[in-house]
Amino acid sequence: MPLELDLAGPSFSPASLKAPALAELGRTTLVATAKPEFVQHPLMRHLPRNVALPCVGELHLWRFRCEWLPVPVQEGDAWLSKSERERARLHPNGALRKRFISARVVVRWIVGHLFDCEPRSVDLHDAGHEKIHARHPHDGRGITIDIAHGGIWIVIGIASAALGLSVIVPSPGAVFDIGETSEQSRRHARYRSLCHALRYVPVDIDEDLLSSAKGVCAFDLGEHGCWHVLDLPMGGKIRAAVTLAAPLTLVHLFGWPKGSIFA
């Protein structure tokens, strides 16, 4: 059975969407959506000049290993807030502690560049389940940040609209049909990213819609709005997806191999 690392929210599955209690919410429909522009960047220790605070429809995605940091370890540690240090201290083992610190250091480094301020001065507001909000100190523009983990990877998404990330890793030792497992994991990643973006609002999603062959698709959830889902190539058996509450027009990608196929 596939699992998502570090998922602290309620447990949902596509099968649960057929429950009678959700019938009154109406059916979800798949709507047409255009393929966004993708701009790939190598993982680097400075941001390109053409990368700015994301506007509506723009998305920044970072993928890196826990060992990668844009600055020396000691410098990055000095950026962490008191509450972040306490959270790191309370992690149950060294590996999870290191992963948490790496993700927070990189988030502060990225947002510091986007806001043109010192990383230690970035005011991050935790919204739970690895979701963070930050507001520009001068013009008040806000961004949403989501962090997901899977295998050796840390994935960070940044947008001006609500978003949700999901990374699905098959359970160690599980034996399944390869094709079926891949498709199930992809549906699971899409569904979990929707759940994360919606903050676990229960919605009626047909499992067949989650099996769309397109790597970018949009779901009309009625009163909950239209949400745009993008598959992320991760390699191996890992599957990932990101959901955004706005049509995707431009996606900046950091850390994916050159030539990676999106959508």
Q: Where do the PLM segments sit?
A:
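Core catalytic alpha/beta fold that binds nucleotide/phospho-ligands
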Residues: P2-A263
